[in-house]
A protein has these predicted regions:
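Conserved C-terminal structural/oligomerization subdomain of aldehyde/semialdehyde dehydrogenase
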Residues: 29-35, 220, 257, 311, ...
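Residue-level signal for inorganic ion chemistry
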Residues: 30, 66, 88, 110, ...
Length: 480
């Protein structure tokens, strides 16, 4: 399946210099999907030169032409949604319907940035001197390294590629080795849409080797990474050596707060969708469930009734709602965390094991814990899987304090019919994104990102493009 691709450098698919490959595994079957091309140092250097050349073309391309190309990419993504979604199911394991939704979200991001490229506004300020003028310009930062994770390869590649292109930058994409095909297909669409040679490049292979060499180069001026906080800190240290600009969206550990005055059935529906999307392997997945104590039993009953009905299986099969975890390592880590949580004193209400009837595949049942305390490991570390710890709270102020007692700050969820609590919660919760009475967070038109050790910078919304632009100020005398 990967034979038509390889490394994408200077507008062409080409095999890696050393002709090396690596296996890509289908998490639903544990079978090899195919062998993907593995880049060497020679390929990285070729991509850097290609991106440097492409930058000179793209930054001098008129914004309206850049907008046209970005819009064309969005249109092609929608036309080829089934092809892209199939890659997501084969490589990530998510159900086809979820894959189609992800492709739609990625297309929306390209469409949004197609318009943003027309709206890079400068400024003219009144000078203190009558015979001078003050002008402010925004110019592309340069070559961007886009480090793309495996859990949402299409939508996260779309955020990075489209914003870079809108700003007039060229980009080198590095997909994860778990999911290279999805990003390769997207890059092929960029070529079909008319992106000039060298403007978008792709390197597939060892993540650490490629990232290190890209960041060691003076050509790369900005890095955008979505990944774990551990990896983000490594990238940040590397970026410091070259003073490269960095956008970082790292780990999350979202609280899900349910107040006593809500419709429990509606909230349970939102919780099921949010928690088990991509089998919990989502940076904004609800992970810490705080239920006001007098509604706890009702919520747990409603939630478990729905969780038990989720159809587990291969995402290619009709009606499947919960696919496998993405790797054998991820499955092992979930099993280890379940045992740790039980040993710390939690009670398993449902799940806690691999489902029966599957000889192959990295499947795990939706798992709900009771008798959980705030100091348990599962409350401190992002599980990245279908695990649901249930806790209770008495007062609103108490739960806000407990929800904020974490080093991560990507997203928070709050459900209440009190306008006072809704407004105070949105202001007091320590996260870059807050969802009040909705489960929808990631929108093309909204700034997505976190605070604390979740990182900094934003993707989406009207401000994201500024992270890909340099500010230039000119103080101009009218004569001399």
């Amino acid at each position: 399946m990967y034979s038509k691709f390889g490394q994408f450098i200077d507008g062409k698919w080409q095999q890696a210099e050393k002709k090396e490959t690596y296996d890509v595994i289908n998490p639903a079957t544990e079978e090899v999907i195919g062998k993907a091309s593995k880049a060497s140092s020679v390929d990285v250097q070729k991509a850097l030169k290609s991106a440097e050349k492409g930058l000179e073309v793209w930054k001098n391309t008129a914004p309206w032409q850049r907008s046209y190309v970005l819009r064309k990419i969005a249109d092609l993504m929608r036309e080829k949604k089934d092809v892209l979604a199939k890659w997501l199911t084969l490589e990530v394991g998510k159900p086809l319907a979820e894959g189609v939704g992800e492709v739609g979200g990625g297309a929306d991001i390209f469409e949004w940035n197609a318009e943003e490229t027309k709206r890079i506004y400068g400024q003219t300020q009144q000078s203190r001197f009558p015979d001078t003028r003050v002008h402010v310009y925004y110019q592309p930062v340069g070559v961007v390294a886009a480090l793309i994770p495996w859990n949402f390869p299409i939508v996260l590649a779309s955020r990075k590629i489209s914003t870079a292109l809108a700003a007039g930058c060229s980009v080198i994409c590095k997909p994860d080795t778990i999911t290279p095909g999805a990003v390769m297909e997207l890059v092929d669409i960029c070529k079909e849409a008319g992106v000039p040679d060298g403007v978008v490049n792709l390197l597939s292979g060892d993540p650490a080797e490629i990232s290190n060499e890209l960041m060691d180069s003076d050509i790369v001026k900005k890095v955008s990474i979505t990944g774990s906080t551990r990896v983000g800190k490594i990238i940040l240290k590397k970026a410091a050596d070259k003073v490269q600009r960095v956008t970082m969206e790292l780990s999350g550990h979202s609280p899900f707060i349910v107040c006593e005055d809500v419709d429990i059935n509606k909230v349970a529906d939102i919780a099921i969708t949010g928690k088990f999307r991509n089998n919990g392997q989502v940076c904004i997945s609800p992970n810490r469930f705080y239920i006001q104590e007098n509604r706890k039993d009702e919520f747990v009953s409603a939630f478990m009734d729905r969780a038990k009905k989720l159809k587990i299986g291969n995402g290619m099969d009709e009606g499947v709602e919960l696919g496998p975890l993405s790797t054998a390592k991820r499955l092992e880590e979930i099993e280890k965390l379940v045992e740790t949580t039980k040993n710390e004193g939690a009670k398993v209400l449902i799940g806690g094991k691999r489902p029966s009837g599957f000889n192959k595949g990295y499947y795990y049942e939706p798992t709900v814990f009771d008798d959980v305390k705030d100091n348990f490991t599962i409350m401190k570390e992002e599980p990245f899987g279908p695990l649901v710890p249930i806790l209770t709270f008495k007062s609103f102020d108490e739960v806000i304090e407990r929800a904020n007692d974490n080093d991560l700050g990507l997203c928070s969820y709050l459900y209440t019919n009190s306008m006072d609590q809704a407004h105070r919660g949105s202001e007091l919760l320590e996260s870059g994104c807050v969802a009040v009475n909705t489960g929808v967070v990631a929108l093309a038109e909204a700034p997505f990102g976190g605070i604390k050790q979740t990182g900094y910078g934003r993707e989406g919304g009207s401000g994201a493009i500024k992270d890909y632009l340099n500010v230039k100020y000119t103080h101009m005398g009218l004569k001399i």
